[in-house]
C-alpha cells in the first residue's frame, strides 16, 4: 500500500484529501468547436532506426485506411480470431489489434508477452484456436525451428508478415511445415498498408506484393524519374490528387521534417525497392 486517499469531509492523518486534489487539478475547458476529420486523433513515435524518432500525428480518417489491412490483407471474416504480435506502444499494434479487425467484424486475440518464446506463441494458437496470424519475419524464423508436430495448428488458416524483408527460405520452410503461404506487406508508422500480397495474388518469396489501391505508389530515382522494371528507386506516395486515407497528417510540431518528407505532392518513404516484370515490389 503506497497511498491512502480519503473521500470524506475531512481527511484523517496520513490520508490525502480527494476533494482538495480535485480542486487542484487543471480545469477542463470545453473546446469551442467540435472535432473534424482533419484534427489529430492519435500519435505514434517512429522506431528511430534511420534517425531520431519522429512523433507521427494521424487524423480521424486514419482508421478507415485500415479497411484494406483487415478485410483484405489479413483476409478476416466475422468468424476469424486474429493475432498480431506487436508491442502495444508501436503503430503496428493498431494495424493488427484494433481498426481494420474491428471494422471487419473479426475477433482479436491480444497477447502481450513479457518475454517472447516460440513455444508460448504456438501454445496460444493451439489452445485458443487462432485462425489468422501476423508477425515480423523474425518471429517466423523462430517458429520454424520448433517441432511443430507437437502442436495442433489446424485452426490456423492465414498468415501475414511485415516489418522487414522476408527470407525466401523462411517462406518455403513454413509452407512445407504448415501448408500456409506467408503473405507479405509493407507500410510505415506514417501510413497504413502501402504494398501487399493480397489473397487473390500468388505470393513471390522476397516480394512485398503490389501497391494498395488506395495509394498512388511509385518508385523514383534521385532525379524524380519513375524507374523501369529491375531498377532501384525510392518508394513514394503521390498526393497531388489529394491526401489518401491512412496517410499521416504531420510530424507533430515539426514543420521542417514534415516538409522534408512530404513536399510538391509527393510523400517520400525513405525506403528503396525495385519492380520485377509483373510489377511486384522487391527489396
PLM feature spans:
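Conserved AMP-binding A3 loop
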Residues: 41-65
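Gly/Ser/Thr-rich phosphate-binding loop
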Residues: 19-20, 103, 130-134, 144-204, ...
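Conserved pre-ATP/AMP-binding loop-to-beta segment of ANL
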Residues: 6-16, 23-45, 52, 75-81
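Conserved ATP-binding/catalytic segment of the ANL
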Residues: 228, 236-283
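Active-site glycine-centered loops adjacent to acidic/histidine catalytic or metal-binding residues
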Residues: 87, 163, 187, 209, ...
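Short beta-strand->loop structural element characteristic of the AMP-binding/adenylate-forming
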Residues: 54-57, 84, 107-114, 183, ...
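Conserved S/T- and glycine-rich ATP-binding loop of Class I adenylate-forming
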Residues: 40, 46-49, 82, 125, ...
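Conserved AMP-binding/adenylation subdomain of ANL enzymes
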Residues: 64-81, 88-131, 146
Amino acid at each position: 500500500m503506497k497511498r491512502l486517499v480519503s473521500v470524506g469531509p475531512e481527511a484523517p492523518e496520513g490520508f490525502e484529501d480527494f476533494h482538495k486534489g480535485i480542486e487542484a487539478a487543471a480545469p477542463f475547458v470545453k473546446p469551442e468547436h467540435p472535432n473534424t476529420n482533419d484534427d489529430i486523433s492519435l500519435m505514434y513515435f517512429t522506431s528511430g532506426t534511420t534517425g531520431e524518432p519522429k512523433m507521427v500525428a494521424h487524423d480521424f480518417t486514419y482508421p478507415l485506411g485500415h479497411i484494406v489491412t483487415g478485410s483484405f490483407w489479413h483476409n478476416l471474416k466475422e468468424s476469424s480470431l486474429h493475432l498480431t504480435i506487436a508491442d502495444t506502444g508501436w503503430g503496428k499494434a493498431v494495424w493488427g489489434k484494433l481498426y481494420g479487425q474491428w471494422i471487419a467484424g473479426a475477433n482479436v486475440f491480444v497477447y502481450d508477452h513479457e518475454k517472447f518464446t516460440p513455444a508460448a506463441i504456438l501454445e496460444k494458437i493451439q489452445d485458443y484456436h487462432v485462425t489468422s496470424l501476423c508477425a515480423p519475419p523474425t518471429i517466423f524464423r523462430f517458429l520454424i525451428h520448433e517441432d511443430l508436430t507437437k502442436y495442433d495448428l489446424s485452426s490456423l488458416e492465414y498468415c501475414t508478415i511485415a516489418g522487414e524483408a522476408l527470407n525466401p527460405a523462411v517462406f518455403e520452410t513454413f509452407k512445407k511445415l504448415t501448408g500456409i503461404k506467408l503473405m507479405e506487406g509493407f507500410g510505415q508508422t506514417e501510413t497504413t498498408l502501402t504494398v501487399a500480397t493480397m489473397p487473390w495474388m500468388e505470393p513471390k518469396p522476397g516480394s512485398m506484393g503490389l501497391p494498395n489501391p488506395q495509394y498512388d505508389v511509385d518508385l523514383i530515382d534521385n532525379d524524380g524519374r519513375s524507374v523501369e522494371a529491375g531498377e532501384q528507386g525510392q518508394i513514394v506516395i503521390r498526393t497531388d490528387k489529394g491526401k489518401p486515407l491512412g496517410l499521416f497528417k504531420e510530424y507533430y510540431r515539426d514543420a521542417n521534417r514534415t516538409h522534408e518528407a512530404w513536399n510538391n505532392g509527393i510523400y517520400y518513404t525513405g525506403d528503396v525497392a525495385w519492380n520485377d516484370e509483373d510489377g511486384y515490389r522487391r527489396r
